[in-house]
Amino acid sequence: MTINEEFALRDQFGWKPAPDDGRFFITAVSGGEEDGSIGVDPDGRSIASEINFNLTTRLYSGAEPQIDHIIRSQYGSYVDALNSLYGQSSTESSTVGALNVWNLRSRVSIVLGGTRRFIDVVIESPAMMDLTEAEQRYFDEGGDLLGASTIYWRDL
C-alpha cells in the first residue's frame, strides 16, 4: 500500500493523526496518547511497510489482577477469530506475554501480541516479510548479532 492509502485507512477508522507527523496516530482505545504508527519502506518512502496499533487500552502496571484475565480472554478471542480467517498461527509465549503470527499467501503477515497490560497488532507488507526472511538467512548462515545491519525489537 502507499502511504496515502494507509492514511485513508487510518482516517476511515477515525484514528486521529499526530499534528507533527501523520504516520503516528491516536486510536479510540489510546487514552489520548499516540498508540499507532505507519512504517515506511526504506527503499520507497511513498510505500508503507507496516501498520501497528493497539487493540486495547494500555493499562498502568498496577492494574487490578482481574484485568489480566480479561485481557487474556480477549487475546484468545482475537486469536480464534484470526485462526478462523487465516488458518493456524505460529505461537510464541514467555513470562511477558504471547505472540501469534499469521503469514498469508499474499506474503502479508499479521502479528498479534499480548501482555498483561495491552494487546496490539502489526500488519506487515510483503517487503517486510522479504526483509525478515533475509535477516533469518543471515543468522542461519552464521551471522552474528553485532554484524547485523537491521534488527527489529518488539516491545510487548
Language model: regions and residue ranges:
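Short helix/turn-capping signatures at newly exposed starts of structured segments
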Residues: 1-96, 107-109, 115-156
